[in-house]
Amino acid sequence: MAGVLVIGGGLAGAAAALRLASAGRTVTLWERERTPAHKICGEFLSWEAQAHLAALGLDLEALGAVAIERVRLATARRVAEAPLGFTARSLTRRALDSALLELAAAAGATVERGVIAREVRADGTVASSHGGTRPETLIVATGKHELRGIGRDGAGTLNGQLGFKAYLRLLPAQRRALDGHVELCLFQGGYAGLQMVEREAANLCFLVSPERWKRLGGDFAGLLADLGAEVPLLGQRLAGAVPLLDRPLAISGVPYGYLHRPAPGETGWRLGDQAAVIPSFTGDGMSLALHSARLATTALLTGAGPADYLAWLARDAGGAIWRATALQRWSSTGGWAERAVALLGLAPGLVRLAAGFTRLQPAAVRRALAG
């Protein structure tokens, strides 16, 4: 296959296809889903993510993105809130990914839906549900899905939790209380994020321990009730809430803290979660995916190689990933969450300080967008 093959139509893959096609490159993108689909994601768009999307020509307002100005932290005994220091946005991945893919197609990329990549072989051939091909340039942006032959080594990462996501219709009073906020609820063995998205739906996305899931017999309704009983604020929000999906989305084995280190002679390009996975409480996962796409396409368009790109990514994101992962490890110690929320109540400005340690730096974003 001549040109570039992008595997995966999420944020990183779609952004890469869009930028390369706009630069005149021949690009084919494979997306496993035949139609727009929901994905496990907190759907919090930080200012960094918004800057990358604006550079790609995406209009979040036109898509109905919801504004978020404040963060509210809750534990079993405490609640505290603070301004974010910027206006975040919230938009379903189904709407966001679809819009990016439409822009990529309009720029000249060939978008093929319903194609499932199965393996990358040693000779560079990619086997798929529609046959095999050997692309001139391969970009792997499969998100949380592993691809045989080019998997991630999760050793040393935080990959033991279970992830769930549900959309809910909250009671009017609870919806009003949540408007303009992202709520982070901290409980034993995990945490949950809750925020409004478009069409007056609420996104509940959370991580729990396998032990809790097993103790509750694998019952999702029972799990929500258990979490709501531990964190009263979450219980208030969930009271009377109506699920909007037939069943929740679920995932396991996500290697939080992963940062890809290239093997000698490695020629493929990894983007998004296939290159780096930052703990989701930072709200920077989508920003990091878009940042990786920007760096990789800059490398491709300027004649640099995968090793150069990965070095740039490690320079920009390695410290934040390490610090966020260390913070998540620390959060599992007894009493940490209560102390953290109490401290935030006394000093709301700590939110900005914490964000500075666990997110991409403004200089890194400016440098990437200038490339």
Regions found by a protein language model. Give the residues of each.
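Beta1/beta-strand and adjacent pyrophosphate-binding region of the FAD-binding site
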Residues: M1-A12
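Residues at the starts of beta-strands that form the adenosine-phosphate
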Residues: G3, T26, T267
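Glycine-rich FAD pyrophosphate-binding loop
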Residues: I7, L18-C41
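Residue-level detector of alpha-helix initiation sites
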Residues: G10-L11, T35-P36, S287
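A conserved beta-strand/loop capping segment in the N-terminal third of enzymes
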Residues: A49-L101
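Predominantly flavin-linked oxidoreductase catalytic cores and closely associated redox partners
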Residues: L103-R237
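FAD/FMN-dependent oxidoreductases across multiple families
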Residues: R212-A299
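C-terminal helical "tail/cap" subdomain of flavin- and related membrane-associated enzymes
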Residues: T298-G371
